[in-house]
Amino acid sequence: MSELSYRGLFDLSGRTAVVTGGAGILGRHFCAGLAESGAAVAVVDLQEAAANELARDLGKRYGVRAIGIGCDVSAPDSVKAMVGRVVHELGEIHILHNNAAGKSDDLDAFLASFEDYSHEQWRKIMAVNLDGMFLVAQAVGKQMVAQGKGGSIIQTASVYGVMAPDHRIYEGSFYQGRKINTPAVYTASKAAVIGLTKHLATYWADKGIRVNTLTPGGIEDGQNDEFQRRYAARVPLNRMGARHEIVGALLYLASDASSYVTGQNIIVDGGLNAW
């Protein structure tokens, strides 16, 4: 028998991970999972104070190096500066979790009907959800190529990037007290992320850089009981997901456990898309 440690394949000690959207609802769980697995973590978020606070907590809790960085992923100069700071403070980058996604401060505009959706709002969301993915992958990928040691890039999509939302479940549905839907810009941007992942997986394969998509299904987070009931009725496991349930797939994709996996979309949705 080989002396290979299968548990050891998931060990991220000695590696540095960059997580965009790192202080967000799912992002903070992703950062915690990477840190607990031994990685140094750069918590990158538009909300710099939240990123710094989480980085301090990760360092204390897991004994790893962690830094918080404020960054607008839709701004090329901000992304370039972010990568430079990570390399300066933490060294080589081994893992990128391209996770930032945009919603609008103007929820009326973000949740408007398709017929009334403004082009300005469409572009604003695309600037983060797709342009931001491109800019961060480009900058970190360039750094990984220069390092010459490969790497792993994971890009967050959504189950609505592989299937359309069931608009019927939004009847009488609310999120934190307001009526909700899933706008077309979200669906379109997340589908594009999956396409970008496949392209980069083949483009950087000869550099040893693996690129995969992580696709969560619906996560329980402040939706009203009616929405949760209707959503769960469409899921074989009969419930929405919990935030921590997405982390295992990330750790698999970030680690040597997935060393022969690239260009794939790992869907964690309770079986929703299996019907």
What is each PLM-predicted segment?
Residues 81-88, 107-127, 230:
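Active-site Tyr-X3-Lys motif and surrounding loop/helix of classical short-chain dehydrogenase/reductase
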